Every structure is written in structure tokens, then in C-alpha cells.
Amino acid sequence: MGRVQTVVIVKNAQGLHARPASLLIKTIKAFDCEVLVEQSGCKANAKSIFGLLSLAAGYDTRLTFTAQGREARVAIEEIRRLFERNFAEVYPAKTGSLIQRGTSQEKNSI
């Protein structure tokens, strides 16, 4: 049960706000491990909405996630996947409003 770590960059124009933070927490809580996140020397419990939001991670912020426990490796893989997919959020240039990927709303906005 070693430590597993990944570094991600926040690519959401609105940063790591409440909706993606909630999805991140829900994802992490599914795994048997502890996860910490660090940004510029500040550390937080990645399973805590207050911890995540207190980092004030805006666009282009670098975050380091460290997991330890039985399912640490798979948790880190899922965290990386969420950030790579930008939490499945799309912000069309014309409206600037949030559209969930894979919905009819997304198809109509293109």
C-alpha cells in the first residue's frame, strides 16, 4: 500500500468550482483510500468540499493529488480521467453558459 501521485492542470475556465468539486468527491469516495490535494504548498482532504474549494483553484492551476490505501492507484486514474475530460463540461463561445456533454442541449448548441 504505497503512495500514488498525479499532477493535473485545471482547464475549466471557471476553475474547480462547486459542481466539478462535488463530482470529484463523489468519485474519490467510491475508493478505499485517503486522498490529499496540494496547491502552492496548501494541502486539503480531497474528500472535503470545503477543503477543495478553499484551494481556490482557478483556470490553469496545478494540483497534486496523493492517494494512499488499497485502491489508491485506481482512484488516481479516475481523478486524472476527470481532469482530462474537463469534468464533461462544455462552455460554448457564443453563450458562455454551461452545457453538459452528451445531452440534447449540447447537440442543439453546435
Regions picked out by a protein language model, each given a short descriptive name:
Residues 1-3, 110:
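Short, charged N-terminal helix-start/capping segments
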Residues 3-7, 62-64:
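Intrinsic-disorder/low-complexity, polar/charged segments enriched in Ser/Thr/Lys/Arg/Asp/Glu/Gln
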Residues 9-58:
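Compact, glycine-rich, soluble single-domain proteins
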Residues 44-47, 95-99:
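Glycine/charge-rich, flexible interdomain linkers and switch-proximal surface loops
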Residues 50-54, 70, 78, 105:
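Alpha-helix boundary/capping detector
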Residues 59-61, 104:
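N-terminal processing/targeting junctions
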Residues 61-98:
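C-terminal structural segments of small proteins and small subunits
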Residues 96-110:
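Short, low-order "capping/linker" segments at domain edges
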